[in-house]
Amino acid sequence: MTLARDAVLWAADHRWLREHLPKYRFVRRSVRRFMPGETLEDAIAAATRLRERGLPTMFTALGENVTDLSDARRVVANYRDAYDRVADAGLDTEFSVKPSHLGLDLDPEAALANLEELATKAAERDNWLWLDMESAD
């Protein structure tokens, strides 16, 4: 692993940094190319601009390691809504999700059911669902 990658992964595991670093303007400007906003509306607006340039996009909801299954269900509901809104906007946008964001660390069977639900939604909308690689300690 590289030093930069190790630093980013270390920072991602620290709540205080996740909550406070985005408040700094230089941090927001540094990540804007990869994360053009904090809402689905921001992402759709950026994807629309990129579509005009012929560029496909990928959406992911930031976060992982939910602390209870109701949080995982909210994640699923948000992705389902995003699939519908992206299809309605006619965007060439695919989605990726982290298994721990669907509750893998809490209940593997519930996480699998959540994953199957999202895969079904992706198929209904003629789209894709990509799984992000996560740490395997």
How does the language model describe each region?
Residues M1-L129, S135-D137:
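Alpha/beta catalytic barrel-like cores
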